[in-house]
Amino acid sequence: MSLVILNWNGREFLDTCLDSLERLDYPEDQLELVLCDNGSMDGSVEHVRTRHPKFRIVALDRNHGFAEGNNVGAKKAAGEWVGFLNNDMEVPADWLERLLTPLDTRPDLACLASRIVSWDGGTIDFIGGGLNFQGHGLQLDHDAPSSPQDVARPLLFACGGAMLVRRRLFLDVGGFDPAYFAFFEDVDLGWRLNLLGHDVWYEPAATVRHRHHGTARRIPPHQLRVLSERNALYTIIKNYDDANLALVLPAALMLLNEKALLMAGVDPARFRVDGAPAPATPPPQPRTGRPDALARVRQRGLAGAGQAALRRAHRAAAALTNTPEPVVTPAAPGGGMPDTALSLLVAISETAHGMDALMQKRAWVQSRRRRSDAEVLGLGGVLLEDPTFGHAGYLDFQHWLARVAGIDAAFESVKL
């Protein structure tokens, strides 16, 4: 067993995390502890070398991101299983033994997901996830004190901040896609594993505490937005079957454009030739597809499908990306677009420039597919709401577009 803790300038969190791992009730001669450092400048490596000599240190020359940093750690590790833990986690002594318990009855499982709670232990952080149709990952019942979904079951994906996976399989299927850098690489990995016929399992008895996004707060919000939106596109391009991708990708691109215009406060009428007909304005749309869709969810910060829950969702998503709730300020003629709006266009551009590699990855996954989209997406569910932008007019447009494009009907059986 190898446990990899990825670190980037997180010295302030390390002692709590590493001390807890050193106290694990697990045979020392069967446990390899690895700190993979992403070029930290805060003395993290020197501190761990002195304070935590049990840890093998893999020191990288620069920040390779969450995805590739963990990939390097997995390649350097020696265990049959490799675990990934965020540096702002704390685990109880029995965490690892409990996480491995499902293998007693399901020895074929490929990946094991932990139960993650808030730092004070009072609310849910991760008990399973789904996604919205545009590819943004969701955490079910986030911030709730309890949940009926908090039971052992197969998942669409494990949270990359506290999971185990068979190391050889992880490497053979490509690991975390290094092109993601960070955000949704765990969603992509879980979707890929499931498509290839491998099971991801949630074990509620294996609980860890999470300080929550200590590293992400150091990254400017417009840069985080590029990662979030671009990686969502990467995920759907690689993993949807042909029919679903043909429905979703055009809509996802149109919605990114709509969101950018709203973020920038652009008035489309200013660009319309006098006398030209204005496009129709979609009428207000219902926010949920079914009465049972009111379960809280979060986009690695989203809460909810109902209106109150959805408002909480956007506050949570804003906290994740260090950005305020949606505020639309009219753009002056000739004025520049704000970076948060431009970040969506950059996400589209980076996706376009990466299409050659994306299509090769898609071909690899689709040629090895063993399960249908309905089977896989049903493990977490698909939300129609966008977890990243709570503008009421935008959500009306999104629901209208999903309906007229046939997306709503296509995902009826798995809709949150």
Question: Can you describe what each PLM-predicted range is?
Answer:
Residues 1-23, 29:
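N-proximal low-complexity "stem/linker" segments adjacent to membrane-targeting elements
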Residues 98-99, 156-207:
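A short, conserved alpha-helix in the catalytic core of glycosyltransferases
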Residues 20, 27, 37-46, 62:
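A conserved acidic beta->alpha catalytic loop
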Residues 82:
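Short aromatic/hydrophobic "clamp" motif used to bind/position activated sugar donors
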Residues 89-132:
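Conserved donor NDP-sugar-binding/catalytic core segment of glycosyltransferases
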Residues 196-359:
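Active-site-adjacent helix/loop segment of glycosyltransferases
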Residues 123-126, 133-138, 144-168, 172, ...:
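A recurrent flexible, glycine/aromatic-enriched loop bordering the glycosyltransferase active site
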